[in-house]
């Protein structure tokens, strides 16, 4: 009996790529990382023009521990 797969969604195409096929209940991460960057930092493309004037990024992680990934098989 043929199966009908729902939409295919590709979240990223890197070494830690993620993709889902059809109906997905939960996607569990296998690794975690934090990054703090100011406005206009992750702009990609040709002829990008960024006008930020004065910009400040406050990256403070106040909690002691984040969600663990030890149970994500």
From Swiss-Prot:
InterPro entries on file: Spore_germination_GerPA
Family statement drawn from the similarity comment of this UniProt entry: Belongs to the GerPA/GerPF family.
Protein name (database record): Spore germination protein-like protein YueG
Organism: Bacillus subtilis (strain 168)
Gene behind the chain: yueG
């Amino acid at each position: 009996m043929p199966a009908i797969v729902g939409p295919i969604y590709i979240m990223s195409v890197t070494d830690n790529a993620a993709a889902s096929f059809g109906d997905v209940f939960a996607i569990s991460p296998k690794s975690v990382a934090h990054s703090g960057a100011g406005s206009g930092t992750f702009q990609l493309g040709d002829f990008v023009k960024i006008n930020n004037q004065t910009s400040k990024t406050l990256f403070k992680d106040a909690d002691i521990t984040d969600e663990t990934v030890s149970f994500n098989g």
